Amino acid sequence: SGSDWTEIYVMDTATRELLPDHIEWAKFTGASWLGDGFYYSAYPAPEAGKEFSNANEGHNVYYHRLGTPQCDDTIAFEDPANPLHFHQAGVSDDQSALILGIGGQGIGDAVMIKDMRRPGSKWVTIEPSQEYYNDVVDVIGGNAYMLTSVGAPRNRFVKINLAQPARDKWVEIIPEDADGGVLTSVQFAGKDRLIAVFDRDASNHAYVYDLDGKLIREIEFPTYGTASFSSSR
């Protein structure tokens, strides 16, 4: 409790000078940028002398606007009824949505999404259970694209309409692997392609799909091993 406190600083990349912005008491978080600020997760400042002994309770998501003190940061999400939950927020690539992962009470994460294009919009629950692995890859055109173990212990890739997020409305794009592999990652590669990586027989296998889940081709590797990709829309 306290050994992994995180402090966040902001640097001007042109001059390599640190700006006055300084975030304390952050934990289990990164910085996800939107506009002239960023979202991060932090706990309330502990009492003096109890920085390393206080229980970790009240993990909130905040928005920090550049050039302002941390005390002016606004709370983007809090859940006083569940003080032991962890909350991590990320912004979609087109900055249209704020994606919230909620953990601490199961083996996975619950997921909520907020439309950032409409002021005052409410959080939409995409998956309420923390008993499943859920990873929202991106939000595009009112649809969330998510890698999930819901209905597929070895994971599948689905599209979720934010206006109708119930499980029975999910559209499966890449199903659970019929050959026993685990779908470990899916990434967008340009506007109309996906790269999916399966862990099968102690080796990674990568495939290119279109956005409807049609297999385009396998990416051939020279030998067995582990593969990772860096791509975006």
Where are these regions (language model features)?
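Peripheral, non-catalytic segments that deliver or gate enzyme domains
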Residues: 1-233
